Amino acid sequence: MCGFVGCFDLNSGSAPIAQGLREELRAQVLEMSKKIRHRGPDWSGVYTGENAILSHERLSIVDPLSGKQPLVSDDGKIILAANGEIYNHKTLRAQFDGKYQFKTGSDCEVIIPLYKKYRATGDFTAMIEELSGIFAFALYDSENDCYLIARDEIGVNPLYQGWEKAGR
């Protein structure tokens, strides 16, 4: 199983986060990520943006050569860190043929175009119901400055959420 760590809402409040604090938070996220490296010894990746940091420790099962995470959408605006197996990924991939330019063969990449499909309506329950499998993920939409954290309905893959003093 893979593992991931994220920090969102870095700019919560009226003032943007100071660069020094962003780097401090990035270091903390990387330190937390090191603690779960045993869950994904094949690849470590990190995304650092204006309002989010995502780190991923990958265990390569599907697409070991190009499925490095965090995954980034074809337009560069959506970032995804996921742990799971999407059993119906081939069916979902076919659904988005010609509508989304997949960058990898990763089964989890289908979460990105699925999110884009449901983003306008905000019906993310319907989005999750389209996914068959065991999964947990954190997705950051940099264009709309929002995030979605979800897991499968049974909760096979662990997913923990918390906040620090400033509410991030």
Regions found by a protein language model. Give the residues of each.
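N-terminus-centric sequence/structural signature that marks the extreme N-terminus
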Residues: 1-168
